[in-house]
Amino acid sequence: MKVFKKLHNLNEILLLISIFFLVCIISLVGIGIIFDLIRKASLSAIRSDPIFFNLRAVLIVLGVFAICFMIIQLVISIMIWKTINTACENIEPKFKKILHWSCFLPFGLLQLYCYQKIKLVKQADNL
């Protein structure tokens, strides 16, 4: 059950990070649209207006957060991949080949994949 608990905790953390990542991306898109609308509406406005500096700073900070969350998701996905790979390597040879490439799946898909294969991990842990 040790592997199962570790996988469950990693999946919960990955889900939380994925939610933060989506919030950052949605905020980036929304603020980017607002920034563009303000810029187009005030063509003759002075570019040193504080609202432009504030929006630029917010866009930069959200972009940095989104990149950090993406890197964290990749690291956690690889940790999940290694955990499942070590737990299930003796159960099914085909499963090991699939897992070799599964760490390159887009973020979130590996989490769903892990939940589907968790029964194999439980079997390996009980052996």
Curated annotation (Swiss-Prot):
Subcellular localization, as worded in the UniProt entry: Cell membrane
Transmembrane segments: 13-35, 57-81
Main location: membrane
Assigned GO CC terms: plasma membrane
Keywords: Cell membrane, Membrane, Transmembrane, Transmembrane helix
Recorded topology in the membrane: Multi-pass membrane protein
Protein name: Uncharacterized protein MG055.2
Organism whose genome encodes this protein: Mycoplasma genitalium (strain ATCC 33530 / DSM 19775 / NCTC 10195 / G37)
Native organism taxonomy: Bacteria, Bacillati, Mycoplasmatota, Mycoplasmoidales, Mycoplasmoidaceae
